[in-house]
Amino acid sequence: MGPLTFRDVKIEFSLEEWQCLDTAQRNLYRDVMLENYRNLVFLGIAVSKPDLITWLEQGKEPWNLKRHEMVDKTPVMCSHFAQDVWPEHSIKDSFQKVILRTYGKYGHENLQLRKDHKSVDACKVYKGGYNGLNQCLTTTDSKIFQCDKYVKVFHKFPNVNRNKIRHTGKKPFKCKNRGKSFCMLSQLTQHKKIHTREYSYKCEECGKAFNWSSTLTKHKIIHTGEKPYKCEECGKAFNRSSNLTKHKIIHTGEKPYKCEECGKAFNRSSTLTKHKRIHTEEKPYKCEECGKAFNQFSILNKHKRIHMEDKPYKCEECGKAFRVFSILKKHKIIHTGEKPYKCEECGKAFNQFSNLTKHKIIHTGEKPYKCDECGKAFNQSSTLTKHKRIHTGEKPYKCEECGKAFKQSSTLTEHKIIHTGEKPYKCEKCGKAFSWSSAFTKHKRNHMEDKPYKCEECGKAFSVFSTLTKHKIIHTREKPYKCEECGKAFNQSSIFTKHKIIHTEGKSYKCEKCGNAFNQSSNLTARKIIYTGEKPYKYEECDKAFNKFSTLITHQIIYTGEKPCKHECGRAFNKSSNYTKEKLQT
């Protein structure tokens, strides 16, 4: 027995067999081939890298390699070049050692038939297609099975029937459970494991079981944290070769997968497949529990967690349990306060790599996501998605309680608190609870002693620099946010954003009591309070309540004696209206 080579551990599929495989099976094949090659290298056996490995590392399909080889090589059939095609079929006479390879590109006339001699140079060339081949064979062995689809010629042996099945497209092996059909029995056997839940391969670290050894091998990397696949371009490391291959496309910018429907191009075939479902509206992934269908497998997986009660991954710090180990890992960072991802530009650190990636765009100033409708550009795809809803008027997030719809999920989350009355944000200093994180953040500043940001104009100090910046506008009366639609200017971006709704949406919030319409839900809420007599804004210092938040703020200034509006002459006022009057007089 000769030394072990890559050919001994290589698995080959016909085109039809390859087409029968789903994405997961193709990825498994790719990983197994790369793993086999790495093992040979580790043992010092493999010297040069086979073309198949180079091809797979680039994320390309093995059948594309065969097409590539056909362009570069002449189809030669001789035992010098193809002794290993059918080793079980021995042909003693050297004149009979004529092998016809799979070269669908070439016609019958272009095929070269070589008589087997001691040296390749001495081979006699025969031309003339199948007739020439038949002449080279004896009468007994000239029973040739021709495959017109891929110009394949076979000696009579058992695998011919198998080849015929591939080209007819028949899938004779059917699963009784689901009715799914397969080209090969081995594929059906693998598929059955899904139904039988046959998990033969168990992880000694966490006890999780798998139905394939290769899946267990991949899983073990989670525990070891090993990342053997490194990108030569940027140094980033990965625990799977397939992930490295996908990552490399970022550097090349290549987008070989184009949608025939709309012309949009993608760097991954899987992304194109997902995209196509937008046009077809296909939802192939169905939940067996409730019947709900989805267009992406990942969304179905997330949905399934609703039905799952089992949460095996528990946080030892707070007791919170999770269904997925990776989510537990991310959660733990909350307790440790660890921020392993640091920005080399400014030194700012983050607890998630995705947050660092988003942050980096601040330094580059890059805005790659452009709106086709108005030309406005954004530095994040999520921001572009939100922006597009201004043009479409889409409000995908609906409240099940009252039916009100919102453009953003975060706004819906805030809205739900109105119905529940929940106050999840509690101050550890004074015990006061808040419904919204923004209100809680503002409140915490009251307890902060350190207020390093001081206003040079009036001496007022602030704990946050952005608050000082906003405060300064009181003195300068600057209005940097200008509406392009009507020319009106504002001193705060939040007020400017609210104003823009007038132009984009009109007055969609109508009062059922008086018929008055408003462009903001907050204005409608304020109107309703007039009829109900409710006074939700209470001043804790004197227990006086108000029906408007602005009235509460005005009252607070009177109570504290603060005079934030300062004139050039030195006089200060507690109301902006009094300040305006003073300006007009001077």
Swiss-Prot record:
Transmembrane keyword on record: no
Organism per entry: Homo sapiens
Protein family: Belongs to the krueppel C2H2-type zinc-finger protein family.
Keywords from the UniProt entry: DNA-binding, Metal-binding, Nucleus, Repeat, Transcription, Transcription regulation, Zinc, Zinc-finger
Domain of life: Eukaryota
Known role: May be involved in transcriptional regulation.
Keyword Transmembrane helix: no
SMART domains, sorted: KRAB, ZnF_C2H2
Name of a matching Pfam family: KRAB
Major localization class: nucleus
GO biological process: regulation of DNA-templated transcription
Cellular localisation: Nucleus
Protein's UniProt name: Zinc finger protein 92
Zinc finger (C2H2-type): 145-167, 173-195, 201-223, 229-251, 257-279, 285-307, 313-335, 341-363, 369-391, 397-419, 425-447, 453-475, 481-503, 509-531, 537-559, 563-586
GO cellular component: nucleus
Chain's gene name: ZNF92
Classification via CDD domains: KRAB_A-box
One GO molecular-function entry: RNA polymerase II cis-regulatory region sequence-specific DNA binding
Residue ranges of domain KRAB in the record: 4-75
InterPro entries linked: KRAB (IPR001909), KRAB_dom_sf (IPR036051), Znf_C2H2_sf (IPR036236), Znf_C2H2_type (IPR013087)
